[in-house]
Design a protein with these regions (language model features):
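Generic secondary-structure boundary/loop-capping signal
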Residues: 31-33, 39, 105, 173
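SAM/dcSAM-binding transferase cores
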Residues: 1-18, 22, 30-37, 45, ...
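The AdoMet/dcAdoMet-binding core of the Class I SAM-like
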Residues: 5, 17, 23, 38-167, ...
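C-terminal substrate-binding/active-site "lid" region of AdoMet-derived donor-dependent transferases
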Residues: 155-220
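A generic structural signal for alpha->beta connector loops
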Residues: 86-88, 112-114, 168, 195-197, ...
Length: 252
């Protein structure tokens, strides 16, 4: 394939490992994965945890909500939100090769009335007033091809993210890397959302830590979270009961 990308954007490749297809950005690091025999299934634990916002809304309300992904990856979250949850879904991706790969190799549907993929700089696009207050579930996974640190990771960026959310909206962020960089990222998120709004998971075995931030801090009773988890598991096949056990507020 001949690239027409600017020099700063990495080349996109994929590799197959049995029934699992991986997306790479000019490196060995995996940027996303798909089961070729079950393309809507969420393969990695951290990707599943990016759906933990489901614990904080009534399951019956999910199809009428709006999900947004900053960073397309292998389109796992975008496909799941659109096809499985039946949500209006918007994804913002900088690299046109990633979008082409997702459409060609990772079963991402074409845009339609409920699905829109924008080729844009996420940090700039989310400052557009048309998005403010419209997003119920914001999922942020913005890493460069070396997976060293988030590309956008300052307090102003997280404040812009919060401005996107509906009153009961949530943001989930994938943080990967050293404990020192994780701690800095959490403090920046807390500065934008408030410490009482932060719910961090423990790191997965692969080193990914998902942090959930609520637009408005709440403390749902554990019984309600468990009830919703049962519904999430039976309706959408996600390990939500495990989330309830390991997801704790930063400030009790």
């Amino acid at each position: 394939m001949v690239s027409t990308l600017p020099a700063l954007l990495p080349e996109v490749q994929f590799s197959d490992e049995g029934r699992i297809r991986h997306l790479h950005l000019d490196s060995i690091w995996i940027q996303g994965s798909m089961r070729t025999d079950a393309p809507l299934q969420l393969v990695h634990a951290y990707i599943q945890r990016m759906m933990a916002w489901l614990l904080f809304v009534e399951p019956a309300s999910v199809p009428g909500r709006h999900a947004m992904q900053l960073g397309l990856g292998a389109a796992s979250l975008t496909k799941f939100s659109h096809k499985v949850l039946g949500m209006r879904t918007t994804a913002i991706e900088l690299n046109p090769q990633v979008l082409s790969a997702c459409r060609g190799w990772f079963k991402l549907p074409a845009d339609n009335a409920r699905l829109q993929v924008l080729l844009a700089d996420a940090g700039q696009e989310i400052r557009e007033p048309r998005w403010w207050g419209t997003v119920d579930a914001l999922q942020v996974d913005l890493y460069d091809h070396e997976a060293a640190a988030p590309v956008l990771d300052d307090e102003n960026f997280y404040a812009d993210c919060r401005r996107l959310l509906t009153p009961d909206g949530c943001m989930t962020v994938n943080l990967f890397g050293r404990s020192s960089s994780y701690a800095r990222s959490v403090e920046r998120i807390a500065a934008a959302f408030g410490h009482s709004a932060i719910w961090p998971f423990k790191a997965t075995r692969e080193g990914n830590t998902v942090v959930l931030a609520q637009n408005r801090a709440t403390r749902p009773p554990r019984a309600l979270l468990s009830e919703r988890a049962d519904t999430i598991e039976s309706r959408w096949g996600l390990p939500a009961a495990q989330w309830v056990r390991v997801l704790k507020p930063l400030v009790p």
